[in-house]
Amino acid sequence: MAVELTSIKLNPENHLLLDQPLLRVPHELARRNFKSVQRIVEREKDYVLPALKETANASLSGSKNPTETIEALDAMITRMQGLKRKMEVLHEEEKKIATQSQKRIQYIQDLYKIPSLADVKYEQWSRTRLNRLLADHMLRSGYLESAKQLAEDKGIADLVDLSVFAQCQRIAHSLRRGETKEALQWCGENKVALKKIQNRLEFELRLQQYIEVLRVGDKAEARQHAKKFLTPHSETQSHDIQRAAGLLAYPPDTRAEPYMSMYSLERWKHLSDLFIRTHHDLLSLSSRPLLQIALSAGLSALKTPSCHSAIASSRASPLSLSTSICPICSTELNELARHVPYAHHTKSSVENDPVVLPNRRVYGMDRLSDMSKKAGVPEGKVKDPITGEIFDVSEVKKVYIS
């Protein structure tokens, strides 16, 4: 008995599998913001408290005159005013993250209030998620302004990580241009997290700086750079450090491997891709766009072996009776669905009069005869609705399902 749509109960847990980064990203951003506050306060405290104590003692002992004491106090006041400005900026960032988290939690809670798939609220919620997935795909593809416009038009700016992907794209593009400054600054801000996961991004960036110094022929500077930035990684990156040392003996136009590859400008693309992977790992972002993951799940539910057969239904002849409305067979989705698994069917629907054609395709005889008649095939002949081949009825053999 068919189950009506109104009786299909919604399972929020299944729907939220795609939405895990929704709360993880603001949580990670809040943690980073707190660490920044902690680091700045500790640095200023380590400077101001000893300086204040020293100034007070000097003033009491008379080793400093009043003018020098006032100058020292003014310097400390200026420093504290700078601290206040930094704290205000970080506080605004914290408020922004808190607002984002609140909106995202509300968005998730709304799903738990929807009783079934037939509820009109589910359609509204799904439309919002689709817009989110589209914006996510645009951001990952580099269409930042389009994603921003979509988010603003649909009122989902707090549900989309615009600033996160904007920063990621900016740094990735700087690496493709041959610049390491922004990427190294990012590594410095995330030094503890990178060390925890034993990521080699910073080492690769320093190695690239070493290569660029050698490219201009400054071997003395290259040795100093290696001693300062590469040697500290000797325990974990000894093999690459040895290869880097070998570069001293080879010019940039060498054809010898692995040095030719190390000098190659393609390394900048490798660094850009490595940065994006590292950035996404730290923020618990998936390596693939969420839209692609969602599509893959849906495509798998629809995919059958005939969708990627040698004879594609979408390319069949005009006389073919095959349909071209299958999403898997469409030009847009066919390649994306190529590597997803087939649908898992626990029950099969088999015609009660199956026959096999000479090309080994199986159909129901009544349905095959009816379609052949509609296609104008001469009497005593049948036509394969997929390939368009025509066979004599005597060539058709009955199939017995055991």
Curated annotation (Swiss-Prot):
Its main location: cytoplasm. SMART domains: CRA, CTLH. A zinc finger (RING-Gid-type) spans 326-387. Residues 126-158 form the LisH domain. Residues 164-221 form the CTLH domain. Belongs to the FYV10 family. This is Protein FYV10. It comes from Coccidioides immitis (strain RS). The lineage of its organism: Eukaryota, Fungi, Dikarya, Ascomycota, Pezizomycotina.
